[in-house]
């Protein structure tokens, strides 16, 4: 491959050197900010050697080359553009300037939640392992693994302790991540999160029960009666409080003399935010988060297969808009209240959609004669089955439309089936074949049935529609 030639073609098809504001690359994609997207020749980019897909998102135009190739194309591109190496965060910042309010909101939530996902995934998967080990009848009728092997009881309890940690101390993780995103000191954000789950406070998990029994303790400060209750497992209170903390900190630094800054600024920022957190932000945020999770769970449980069908059908188009990033916050809230919600229904539906996109992509590979397209479709389809849908969706399915439509239909029908049987996940993970450990043990069989339905329908429809398209072309 002539990478200099490929890079020059990319520049030309993007509207020329003067139309490019910033450029970087990640593991598989060129990430470019252009001044005018109307100048982009999408058909021309599609025909450039090595290009596996393209799409616009978050103010950036991204071209998929794949690992091992993208870095070489970028090296040639940056040389031709006369720019130094840029980080993806720098390009993202440049792209953000072009985004609307809704896009910035979605990106903001993603920037906060994506860094903490490994902790949530680890805790969630361990929670799934704990559930499998303690579920009666999962391996042996009327008994669980601990009943069969009492010697591992402490190990199982230890697994449960680790599994719960990210959710119990979720405000600490979110406080750090959100305050950093809002431009404040992340360690002050972590301290704020610690305050919200301080052991001296009543357990936030049992707030409703404690309130019903009349056992709530109070602080009496400035004539206010403030509940001494923690915010374990909550999302909204710490997000809002982190924004207040960062805003206060930045404004205080403007007026506090530099020699007093390290003393006065953190003191007043944390004290004022803490007071607001327990008097206004926390109580309102707790109710808002509870209403959101309760409302979504009620809709899923009430609408049943109809709600599942609608959500499953629309999930892939939602992914295209980037709005699916907001689901991380909702899922985190649902999992944090798993005893009440039973888990998250979003993850299984996302898995049905991903499986459908992967199967449709493989169906396209089966029916198409173009060797280049097949070379892209096979690995992309396998990737989607494993939970990474980007290459399949943008590289093949959307490009030819009928695989994408077939996948939407497969996802809708399979999501209706799993919704009918109330399939839920008790952990996050890769939404696809690797997501099996995340599913509630009593839902595992129907989850597998759902994946089979999703893949079968998407693959079959893609082959039928593909052959029909070929006949029309002839």
UniProtKB/Swiss-Prot annotation:
Assigned EC number: 2.7.1.211
UniProt keyword Transferase present: yes
Ranges for domain PTS EIIC type-1: 107-474
Membrane spanning residue stretches: 109-129, 158-178, 182-202, 229-249, 264-284, 303-323, 345-365, 376-396, 403-423, 444-464
Catalytic residues in the record: 26
First-tier enzyme category under EC: transferase
Annotated protein name in UniProt: PTS system sucrose-specific EIIBC component
Gene Ontology MF terms in the entry: kinase activity; protein-N(PI)-phosphohistidine-sucrose phosphotransferase system transporter activity; protein-phosphocysteine-trehalose phosphotransferase system transporter activity
NCBIfam families: EIIB_glc, PTS-II-BC-sucr
Family matches, as Pfam families: PTS_EIIB, PTS_EIIC
One GO CC term on file: plasma membrane
Domain comment quoted from the record: The PTS EIIB type-1 domain is phosphorylated by phospho-EIIA on a cysteinyl residue. Then, it transfers the phosphoryl group to the sugar substrate concomitantly with the sugar uptake processed by the PTS EIIC type-1 domain.
Subcellular location: Cell inner membrane
UniProt topology in membrane: Multi-pass membrane protein
Keyword set includes Glycosyltransferase: no
Described purpose of this protein according to its UniProt entry: The phosphoenolpyruvate-dependent sugar phosphotransferase system (sugar PTS), a major carbohydrate active transport system, catalyzes the phosphorylation of incoming sugar substrates concomitantly with their translocation across the cell membrane. This system is involved in sucrose transport.
GO biological process: phosphoenolpyruvate-dependent sugar phosphotransferase system; trehalose transport
Catalytic activity, as annotated: N(pros)-phospho-L-histidyl-[protein](out) + sucrose = sucrose 6(G)-phosphate(in) + L-histidyl-[protein]
Species lineage: Bacteria, Pseudomonadati, Pseudomonadota, Gammaproteobacteria, Pasteurellales
Main localization, broad class: membrane
InterPro entries for this protein: Glu_permease_IIB (IPR036878), PTrfase_EIIB_Cys (IPR018113), PTS_EIIC (IPR003352), PTS_EIIC_1 (IPR013013), PTS_IIB_1 (IPR001996), PTS_IIBC_sucr (IPR010973), PTS_Sugar-Specific_Components (IPR050558)
Keyword list, A-Z: Cell inner membrane, Cell membrane, Kinase, Membrane, Phosphotransferase system, Sugar transport, Transferase, Transmembrane, Transmembrane helix, Transport
PTS EIIB type-1 domain ranges (all copies): 4-87
């Amino acid at each position: 491959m002539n990478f200099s030639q490929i890079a020059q073609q990319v520049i030309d098809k993007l509207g020329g050197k003067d139309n490019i504001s910033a450029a970087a690359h990640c593991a598989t994609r060129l990430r470019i900010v252009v001044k005018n997207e109307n100048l982009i020749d999408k058909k021309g980019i599609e025909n450039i050697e090595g290009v596996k897909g393209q799409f616009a998102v978050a103010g950036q135009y991204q071209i998929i080359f794949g690992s091992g190739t993208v870095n070489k194309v970028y090296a040639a591109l940056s040389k031709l553009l006369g720019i130094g190496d840029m980080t993806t965060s720098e390009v993202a910042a440049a792209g953000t300037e072009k985004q609307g309010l809704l896009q910035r909101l979605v990106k903001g939530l993603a920037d906060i939640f994506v860094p903490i996902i490994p902790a949530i995934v680890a805790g969630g998967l361990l929670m799934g392992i704990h559930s499998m080990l303690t579920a009666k009848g999962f391996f042996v009728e009327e008994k669980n693994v601990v009943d069969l092997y009492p010697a591992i009881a402490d190990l199982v309890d230890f697994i449960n302790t680790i599994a719960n940690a990210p959710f119990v101390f979720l405000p600490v993780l979110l406080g750090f991540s959100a305050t950093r995103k809002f431009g404040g000191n992340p360690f002050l954000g972590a301290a704020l999160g610690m305050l919200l789950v301080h052991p001296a406070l009543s357990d936030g998990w049992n707030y409703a029960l404690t309130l019903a029994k009349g056992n709530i303790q109070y602080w009496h400060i400035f004539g206010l009666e403030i509940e001494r209750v923690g915010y374990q497992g909550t999302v909204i209170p710490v997000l809002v409080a982190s924004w207040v903390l960062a805003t206060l900190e930045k404004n205080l630094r403007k007026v506090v003399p530099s020699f007093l800054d390290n003393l006065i600024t953190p003191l007043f920022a944390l004290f004022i935010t803490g007071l607001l957190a327990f008097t206004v932000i926390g109580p309102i945020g707790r109710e808002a988060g509870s209403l959101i999770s309760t409302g979504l769970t009620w809709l899923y449980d009430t609408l049943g297969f109809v709600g599942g069908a609608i959500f499953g059908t629309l999930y892939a188009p939602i992914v295209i808009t980037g709005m699916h990033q907001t689901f991380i916050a909702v899922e985190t809230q649902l999992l944090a209240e798993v005893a009440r919600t039973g888990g998250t229904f979003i993850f299984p539906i996302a898995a049905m959609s991903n499986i459908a996109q992967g199967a449709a992509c493989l169906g396209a590979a089966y029916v198409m004669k173009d060797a280049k397209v097949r070379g892209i479709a096979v690995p992309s389809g396998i990737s989607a089955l494993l939970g990474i849908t980007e290459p399949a969706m943008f590289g093949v399915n959307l490009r030819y439309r009928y695989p994408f439509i077939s996948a939407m239909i497969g996802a809708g029908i399979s999501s209706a089936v799993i919704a009918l049987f109330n399939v839920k996940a008790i952990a996050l993970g890769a939404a696809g074949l690797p997501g099996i450990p995340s599913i509630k043990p009593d839902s595992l069989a129907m989850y597998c049935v759902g994946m089979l339905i999703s893949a079968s329908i998407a693959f079959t429809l893609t082959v039928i529609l593909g052959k029909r398209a070929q006949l029309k072309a002839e």
